[in-house]
């Protein structure tokens, strides 16, 4: 079953029945009889008759495939027949695919909560009796409409088993069993390495489905999107922090840090590799929810949620909505996808640059954006002390080691310096005190003047509001301070 939402467009004139040619003139291969019956029935709903039309005479469409991250799990409103008891796909009418600004007459959401690559690939298995293998849903949509974008979000339910790991981490917190990082970190990269070929195969199979439907590879966009982190360790910086139980950010704070700083970045690297190696367009959403995690301001993810009435009596399905994008999160996905489609980029990243709630697209993956700031005079690197990212964390010098608390990205539009730990913490002059000797800290990115810096010739970095002052490291492990610019090596960074 595929959820279809018509969002406008007039009925096209019928063409010859079966095998209609695509833009490049390639005829579609016939579907198996069972799928052809479904295709004809859906064509009749779309156009008033079951004929398969030439590509140029069809309604335009978008489709999403994958798992709970993109199906709408966590939104809370679900399509009939996908909210139990026999089908838990949890497809939401508020899912991202239905909310983009990409012009399309029809949007399809074939994604299903819990799906692994084996539920998507050609010849794969159905998740539920009333479901199709997702590649079969794509084959039908590709013949009834003119697909403009195919979105795939997959990998979490393969070797990674992200959901069970998350459940175990939360359970260990409730039962005082200790953190889960020591249990999972040693084998995490092996899990990532295992999922990469599965995602690559999935992309390849989707290409095959589209070619069999008569499409050339350039007739549509095939987008692979990575997963954002729903949790983070800085929740107590929220001035309205509700507490872990009321807010649903249950789990050890250090595990939330491991998830944000290690587990999700490794996963993102794997998804990116799969996208690049298979020739898909890649959207890096790994930092999209930074500053919008569970228990933060304007959260874009749902925290721990227990549905006591569906199912009843409660079972494992009662908590399946937990730690998934909420409606605002899907709105953020939709914005990023809209910008990506319009850009024509083959690889891009998306994030909220300054706590605006408005995602922005950048023409690179985040892996390539962050670099150390090495001081010419001391040879040490600018470092967020102790690997922390709480508001007020002191920034200073330390031996260069390549970890994420020494990675920095300069946003030329905002003129802000973001630490790699989180897109939501920027270098900050506390209180806008522009004076010699003033120390610098991390603070929630806001786009205000005390977070704006100018990278000048010669490697100096100066507050935009006080260009006579320079960031200075007086010693290899001294705090980073403002001092009058004097041209010394301690004020130059490479």
What positions do the PLM features span?
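Serine-esterase "nucleophile elbow" of acetyl-processing enzymes
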Residues: 40-113, 170-171
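Structural recognition of the beta-strand scaffold that forms the well-ordered cores
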Residues: 61-73, 106-111, 148-153, 158-160, ...
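Short coil-to-helix leader/linker segments, especially the first N-terminal amphipathic alpha-helix
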Residues: 12-13, 27-54, 125-133
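Histidine-centered active-site loop/cap adjacent to the catalytic His
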Residues: 307-358
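Extracellular glycan-recognition/adhesion modules and their associated mucin-like linkers
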Residues: 361-389, 407-434, 450-477, 492-494
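Secretory targeting and sorting signals
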Residues: 1-23
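Alpha-helical cap/lid subdomain in secreted, periplasmic
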Residues: 136-309, 313
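Catalytic-core regions of hydrolytic enzymes
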Residues: 118-146
């Amino acid at each position: 079953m595929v959820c279809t939402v018509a969002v406008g467009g007039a009925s096209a004139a019928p063409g010859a029945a079966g095998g209609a040619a695509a833009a490049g003139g390639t005829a579609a291969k016939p579907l198996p009889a069972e799928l052809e019956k479904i295709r004809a029935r859906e064509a009749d709903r779309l156009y008033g008759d079951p004929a398969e039309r030439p590509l140029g005479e069809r309604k335009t469409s978008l489709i999403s495939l994958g798992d709970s991250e993109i199906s709408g799990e966590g939104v809370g409103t679900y399509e009939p027949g996908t909210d139990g008891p026999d089908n838990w796909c949890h497809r939401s009418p508020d899912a991202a695919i239905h909310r983009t600004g990409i012009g399309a007459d029809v949007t399809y959401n074939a994604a299903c909560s819990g799906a692994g690559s084996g539920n998507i690939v050609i010849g794969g298995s159905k998740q539920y009796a009333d479901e199709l293998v997702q590649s079969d849903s794509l084959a039908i949509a590709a013949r009834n409409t003119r697909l403009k974008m195919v979105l795939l979000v997959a990998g979490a339910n393969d070797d990674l088993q992200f959901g069970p790991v998350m459940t175990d981490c939360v359970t260990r917190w409730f039962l005082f069993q200790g953190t889960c990082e020591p249990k999972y970190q040693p084998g995490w990269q092996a899990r990532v390495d295992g999922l990469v070929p599965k995602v690559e195969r999935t992309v390849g199979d989707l290409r095959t489905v589209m070619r069999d439907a008569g499409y050339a590879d350039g007739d549509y966009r095939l987008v692979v999107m990575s997963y954002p982190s729903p949790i983070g360790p800085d929740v107590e910086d929220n001035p309205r922090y509700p507490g872990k139980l009321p807010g649903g950010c249950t789990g050890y704070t250090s595990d939330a840090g491991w998830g944000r700083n290690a587990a999700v970045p490794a996963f993102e690297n794997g998804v990116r590799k799969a996208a690049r190696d298979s020739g898909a367009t890649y959207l890096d959403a790994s930092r999209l929810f930074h500053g919008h995690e569970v228990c933060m301001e304007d959260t874009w993810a749902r925290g721990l949620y227990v549905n006591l009435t569906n199912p009843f009596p409660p079972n494992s399905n009662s908590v399946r909505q937990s730690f998934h994008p909420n409606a605002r999160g899907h709105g953020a996905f939709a914005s990023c996808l809209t910008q990506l489609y319009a850009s024509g980029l083959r690889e891009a990243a998306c994030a909220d640059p300054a706590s605006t709630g408005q995602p922005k697209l950048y023409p690179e993956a985040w892996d390539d954006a962050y670099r150390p700031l090495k001081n010419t005079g001391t040879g040490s690197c600018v470092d967020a002390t102790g690997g922390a990212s709480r508001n007020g964390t002191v920034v200073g010098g330390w031996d260069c080691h390549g970890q994420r608390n020494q990675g920095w990205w300069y946003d030329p539009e905002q003129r802000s310096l973001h630490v790699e730990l989180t897109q939501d913490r920027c270098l900050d002059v506390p209180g806008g005190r522009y004076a010699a000797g003033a120390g610098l800290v991390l603070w929630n990115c806001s786009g205000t003047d005390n977070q704006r810096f100018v990278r000048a010739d010669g490697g100096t970095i100066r507050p935009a509001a006080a260009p006579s002052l320079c960031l200075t490291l007086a010693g290899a492990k001294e705090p980073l301070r403002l001092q009058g610019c004097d041209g010394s090596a301690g004020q130059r960074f490479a």
